[in-house]
Curated annotation (Swiss-Prot):
GO CC terms of this entry: plasma membrane
SUPFAM superfamilies named in the record: Gated mechanosensitive channel
PROSITE patterns reported in the protein's UniProt record: MSCL (PS01327)
Protein's name in the database: Large-conductance mechanosensitive channel
PANTHER family: LARGE-CONDUCTANCE MECHANOSENSITIVE CHANNEL (PTHR30266:SF2), MECHANOSENSITIVE CHANNEL MSCL (PTHR30266)
InterPro entries, per the entry: Mechanosensitive_channel_CS, MS_channel, MSC/AndL, MscL_channel
Lineage per the UniProt record: Bacteria, Pseudomonadati, Chlorobiota, Chlorobiia, Chlorobiales
Binding partners and assembly: Homopentamer.
The keyword Lipid metabolism belongs to this UniProt entry's keyword annotation: no
Length: 161
């Protein structure tokens, strides 16, 4: 049973998936920091000095009555809040992550299309007399025994060997 688990765990797909999850988590952390620490502060300044992480609505006051200066104060007082500013931060983070994944998938699909675009040369051709498929290098059709046009001289093939 341990051997079967080892084979399963070391399969390419499982290892690739694990690496993808780890890298995805790290990328998510970077995007969240980018949004909360780099993008939202200037956006807050443009909208009149608003800190989006402190945008909330008090649904029920806590032990100490409001108004509360910040979300942290409302939480410390035990107030029930609707934190729409944090939701806006998460929405911006999601949009950036989704767009990044879209660009990545689009690039991978383009690479796959290039690989699929180069088809292998045909291995068979059609006899013009009886329309039977014959090997590309055949000089005569096996069905109707007609000599095929464009075929190499059979004697030349033997002499070349």
């Amino acid at each position: 049973m341990l051997k079967e688990f080892k084979e399963f765990a070391l399969k390419g797909n499982v290892v690739d998936m694990a690496v993808g999850i780890i890298v995805g988590g790290a990328f998510g952390s970077i995007v969240n920091t980018l949004v909360s620490e780099v993008m939202m502060p200037p956006l807050g300044l443009l909208t009149g000095g608003v800190d989006f992480s402190n945008l909330y609505v008090v649904m029920k006051e806590g032990v100490e009555p409001g108004p509360y200066a910040a979300l942290a104060n409302a939480r410390a007082a035990g107030a029930v809040t609707l934190n729409y500013g944090l939701f806006l931060n998460a929405l911006v983070s999601f949009t950036i992550m989704a767009f990044s994944v879209f660009i990545l998938v689009k690039a991978i699909n383009r690479l796959r299309q290039k690989a699929d675009a180069a088809p292998a040369p045909p291995s068979k051709k059609t006899c013009p007399y009886c329309l039977t498929l014959v090997p590309q290098q055949a000089s005569r059709c096996p069905a109707c025994t007609s000599e095929l046009p464009g075929a190499a001289d059979p004697g030349a093939r033997v002499a070349a060997k």
